[in-house]
Design a protein with these regions (language model features):
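Glycine-rich ThDP/TPP pyrophosphate-binding loop and its adjacent helix/strand module
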Residues: 38-208
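Alpha-helical support elements that line or immediately flank enzyme active sites
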Residues: 7-18
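Acidic-glycine-rich active-site phosphate/pyrophosphate-binding loop
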Residues: 20-41, 72
């Protein structure tokens, strides 16, 4: 959830965990809605997170717990392509594959950029799909991760997999839909000013 905390907060507000108006305080000084979810301060958060690589480890634990308790739920976790440079990710993947956790779905946002540059230049994790296959994952490659129909098809397929965890590798465009943000690493974690915000929203609304 850390990677997309703003999306998570929006979903929680929609479900009534806290007022939607509080979303306007995202990452403000003194706000309880910060860049990393904090279970002590945010209703609906099951675990605090921060460092890259923690998400998949927690997800593996949840998936194993579900198996041990004969619970039928599935566990989904989102990773960045830069995040999978962390060794902790592959320790968790190794365990998930060895324990045949078919209730686990790992989604990799493969946009090719991370906070300090091009992923391939920083420390290349490619080919991502082959690495997950080596750890006994069923792998689904999504050619356009910004296409909702392709994503839905991938999630539908993941629900049919038995005997092994699933990794959905999505090829995405960072900043998709905003001309001056697309494929620009400088917008990693950066907030637009009022003028940039107005332009971005106009472009997104025009695109539908």
């Amino acid at each position: 959830p850390t990677r997309r905390s703003s999306d998570l907060y929006a979903a929680l507000a929609e479900k009534g965990y806290f007022p939607k108006e509080d979303l306007l305080t995202l990452r403000h000084l003194g706000s309880y809605l910060q860049g990393h979810p904090d279970m002590k301060h945010i209703p609906g958060i099951d675990m605090s997170s921060g460092s890259l690589g923690q998400g998949i480890s927690a997800a593996v634990g949840m998936a194993l717990g579900a198996k041990l308790q004969n619970k039928a739920f599935r566990v989904y976790t989102l990773l960045g392509d830069g995040e999978i440079q962390e060794g902790q990710v592959w320790e968790a993947a190794m365990f998930a594959g060895a324990k045949h956790l078919d209730n686990l779905v790992v989604i990799v946002d493969n946009n090719g950029l991370q906070i300090d540059g091009n992923v391939a230049d920083v420390n290349s994790p490619y080919p991502i799909d082959k690495k997950f296959e080596a750890f006994n994952f069923h792998v689904i490659n999504v050619a356009d991760g910004n296409d909702f129909d392709q994503l839905k098809a991938a999630f539908d397929e993941a629900r049919t997999v038995t005997g092994m965890p699933t990794a959905i590798i999505t090829k995405t465009v960072k900043g998709k839909g905003v001309s001056f943000m697309e494929n620009q690493v400088g917008w990693h974690g950066k907030a637009p000013n009022d003028e940039e915000y107005a332009i971005a929203m106009a472009e997104l609304e025009k695109a539908g």
